[in-house]
Amino acid sequence: MIYQYQTKNNPIFQRWTEQFPTPDFGFLPIAFFKSHSIVTQNPQEPNQLPEIVFSSSGTTGSIPSKHHVLSDELYRQSYTQAFELMYGPVEQYCFIGLLPSYLERSGSSLIYMVDDFIKQGQPKSGFYLNEYQAVANIIQHNQSNQIP
């Protein structure tokens, strides 16, 4: 079902499947995300532009891959629901972000998601770059208060 939807609504994927028509080969090479705008269009809004474009960190001197997101709201709902299916409500968790190399660059989907979880999570949630004692204190506080 997903394969058929992508084939119908994603022009790049559609052309790829014309060359490789088997659903067993239903993915695009990572290089395509560097050279093409890979977007699955909403059939009701075929000319919708992305609300967000994330980029990979890439390696020094390389062209980063791009991840075009048409709906910020749908993207947030997707990762939040996936988290909550596995772990329960986001609000009950304290999220501690220790992501130095990611914080120093823009366009990271991981930072975007962690930042959103921090905003939804317990009050002591946050990014703690090189604040090891603060992190240790928060973990100790959370353990004694049974905050995951």
Region roles according to the model:
Residues M1-E91, I96-G97, Y132-Q133, Q140-S144:
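Nucleotide 5′-phosphate-binding alpha/beta core
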Residues Y102-P148:
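Conserved adenylate-forming
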